[in-house]
């Protein structure tokens, strides 16, 4: 639950709304609560309204968006462009990049605007769409990381060299999106775009969760706890178990020859890279999930003076996972590092930079050489990749 969503909760009394309002919307100067009605537009009190804090938030969100769009687009580009990169594991990594791109382009810009303005001014459609899209992308990322871990566990621990076919991998990706869409759907359905009158003559537009049920049965809390288990705790338990067994297997492995040593070393590096991806995902999302859970269980957390700032900082940390993955690919995986470099090189250097794609380029050079033997044939300059 976001800081402004709490004000729009259906089960809150006017007194509770006023109490929460005094935490978030009191004027910066000292004004008695009884006189708030005299000021038609009281200012936000929390630190997120300070200019210097807003500049930092703008820089943080824009940096995440820029790095995420560039990095994830590059991952998708090299997997599509180079045939040697079209492996099952890389298809799953590309799916991870697509999910992160969804967050970078559709969620973060609107979240930043919502945070800076202090109320939802983006209309009812985006009110339902943005939270749903973010939840969808996070679910897809978690499912994809789990599938990658299980696939590598199957191949390395049990020596099953018959890999998952590309057709099956696409089917798994489709199922991942379908299941994720179903799990995230309550955030689009049980949502309300409303105008809330906090005090007389002062209203704000709120995009808040609106769950059915009354009394002690809080469906919002039930959903939050369920998603924490399904989206975070259970996948991380499965992934940790899989990579622990993989690590143990590789550590105790004895290679009979130099060729197998090289193959074993490559597997180790790839596994290390994927473990780092999972660790970054787990660590970056842990503060946000924990804070969300505590907020849903204990409403007194909403009374914290800097609740909105804490929520925003944890959200920024969580969103860092959307650009961290491409950095890990480029840093820890030779294939990706080579492909990234190739994307910025000219074709005449392709064969020296990326041997896997050199055959087609060499064939083209031979054809151009034959043409250049005939008078009148002009030399064709190679184009950029």
UniProtKB/Swiss-Prot annotation:
The keyword Lipoprotein applies. Residues 76-90, 150-169, 243-273, 330-385 are cytoplasmic. Disulfide bonds join 127-207. Keywords: Cell membrane, Disulfide bond, G-protein coupled receptor, Glycoprotein, Lipoprotein, Membrane, Palmitate, Phosphoprotein, Receptor, Transducer, Transmembrane, Transmembrane helix. Glycans are attached at residue 11. It comes from the Eukaryota. A lipid is attached at residue 346 (S-palmitoyl cysteine). CDD domains: 7tmA_NPY2R. InterPro entries: GPCR_Rhodpsn, GPCR_Rhodpsn_7TM, NPY2_rcpt, NPY_rcpt. Residues 1-54, 112-128, 191-221, 295-308 are extracellular. GO terms for cellular component: non-motile cilium; plasma membrane. Receptor for neuropeptide Y and peptide YY. PANTHER family: NEUROPEPTIDE Y RECEPTOR, NEUROPEPTIDE Y RECEPTOR TYPE 2. This is Neuropeptide Y receptor type 2. It comes from Gallus gallus (Chicken).
